[in-house]
């Protein structure tokens, strides 16, 4: 890896253009695999705008042909979705989300980057387990927010959203209840159904027994996935261990939050334990146990 040069990789033309579905289902190939990872590590420049990021991504070889593979692309893929929102709406993506999602749902404590003294006072610390104790790593190299603040010139859709359990619970319930919460219609029912349905035309499993919906990972085969969730459960996790999931079969939505840098996002052992406990109590298959 030390001698690997991503600039000398042999490339071939893409078979087709990348679609919105590709971006949402992590099947675009953008900034994915060894080449994408090495290019990301090489990039030390402060981020200035989504437009500038798009130009940068355009010069990075895809990890695979669009729609023919799967690879987690939370930075490039979701930044491009943010740029698309700005182009279509004519608004900054942060303002658009506040107007169309946060305010209608009453998510008053959800925002991209704290910009007031009161907000900064309420931000929780970031921790990492070192040996047998948790160490405060806020603001250090292990704190991804410090890295994301390279992007102060614009709202990075790949990260930087702050929220609370109460606020995010409203968002989760909106999805569980078919796109509507507390009288506010955010999404059509068919849109929510699409989010929770396998999206790529090719059957692509990012993990055994799991497939991508639109922005969501779906437990298609819980036994194969070694999961306690019921079939069709969907959701996603944050880099610091936040986790939410929705089980349409059980009429269940759950939100869990923590703030540690060593939990491996969606692979967190804590997230799996939370799922085991929740489905053990409320899951359809366990109601008669």
PLM feature spans:
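Short, ordered coil/turn segments that flank beta-strands lining enzyme active or ligand-binding pockets
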Residues: 130, 248-249
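Short, structured beta-strand/loop micro-motifs enriched in basic residues and often containing a Trp
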Residues: 235
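Short, small/polar residue-rich loop motifs at catalytic or cofactor-binding pockets
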Residues: 238-240
């Amino acid at each position: 890896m030390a001698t690997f040069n991503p600039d000398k990789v042999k490339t071939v033309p893409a078979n087709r253009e990348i679609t919105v579905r590709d971006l949402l289902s992590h099947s675009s190939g953008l900034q994915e695999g060894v080449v994408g990872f090495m290019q990301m590590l090489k990039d030390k420049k402060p981020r200035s705008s989504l437009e500038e990021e798009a130009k940068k991504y355009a010069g990075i070889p895809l990890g695979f042909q669009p729609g023919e593979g799967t690879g987690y692309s939370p930075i490039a893929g979701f930044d491009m979705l943010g740029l698309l929102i700005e182009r279509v709406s004519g608004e900054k993506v942060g303002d658009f989300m506040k107007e169309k999602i946060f305010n209608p749902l009453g998510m008053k404590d959800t925002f991209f980057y704290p910009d007031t003294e009161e907000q900064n006072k309420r931000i929780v610390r970031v921790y990492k387990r070192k040996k047998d104790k948790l160490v405060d790593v806020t603001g250090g190299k292990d704190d991804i927010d410090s890295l994301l603040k390279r992007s102060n010139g614009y709202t990075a859709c790949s990260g930087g959203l702050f929220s609370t359990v109460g606020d995010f619970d409203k968002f989760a319930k909106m999805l569980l209840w078919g796109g509507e919460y507390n009288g506010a219609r955010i999404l059509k029912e068919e849109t929510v159904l699409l989010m929770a349905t396998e999206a790529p035309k090719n059957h692509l499993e990012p993990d055994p027994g799991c497939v991508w919906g639109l922005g969501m990972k779906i437990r298609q085969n819980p036994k194969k996935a070694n999961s306690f969730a019921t079939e069709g459960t969907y959701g996603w996790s944050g880099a610091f261990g936040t986790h939410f999931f929705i089980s349409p079969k059980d009429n269940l939505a759950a939100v869990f939050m923590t703030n540690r840098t060593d939990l491996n996002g969606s692979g967190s052992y804590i997230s799996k334990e939370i799922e085991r406990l929740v489905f053990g109590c409320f899951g359809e298959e366990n109601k008669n146990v």
